[in-house]
């Protein structure tokens, strides 16, 4: 989910392959077809196992967690002005090479996407003034020394 959140943080039109929204894994069967084996694009073109879609509403399942989180992220992206195509986009130094922080600014509003690309708990060292809202949970927070679990991300806006 963290990689999809990162992709949705970027400008432009995000792309999901069919099945990504349900956690479908790569299909390597194309390597057994002489006409397709040299074209790695087929890794994403396997048949969709429709039984995965049956659990998309149940957040206790992998499929449900992925589907519901992506749905929420897409809604936030549509609602937040900082995702405008004309927003200024920067990286923000948090003093740890395994954490990427993306800052988007537009019309006086700010968005921070903070992504831990490590499997270990890390701290994003930040000292932002003012309160920000966690766009996923609605909780208010100061952006000071944000702790992230392995592969965790946060989206904050003002």
Language-model features and meaning:
Residues 1-111, 117-125, 129:
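Loop/helix patches that line or flank the sugar-binding groove of alpha-linked glycan CAZymes
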Residues 9-11, 138, 144-145:
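Short acidic, Pro/Gly- and aromatic-enriched capping/linker segments at domain boundaries
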Residues 50, 137, 158:
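Active-site donor-binding loop signature of nucleotide-sugar glycosyltransferases
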Residues 103, 134, 157-158:
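A general secondary-structure boundary signal
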Residues 106, 136, 149:
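Short, ordered coil/turn segments that flank beta-strands lining enzyme active or ligand-binding pockets
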Residues 113-115, 126, 141-147:
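Short amphipathic beta-strand/extended segments with alternating polar/hydrophobic composition
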Residues 127-139:
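Solvent-exposed beta-hairpin/edge-strand motifs
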Residues 142-158:
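C-terminal beta-strand-rich structural cap/linker in extracellular carbohydrate-active enzymes
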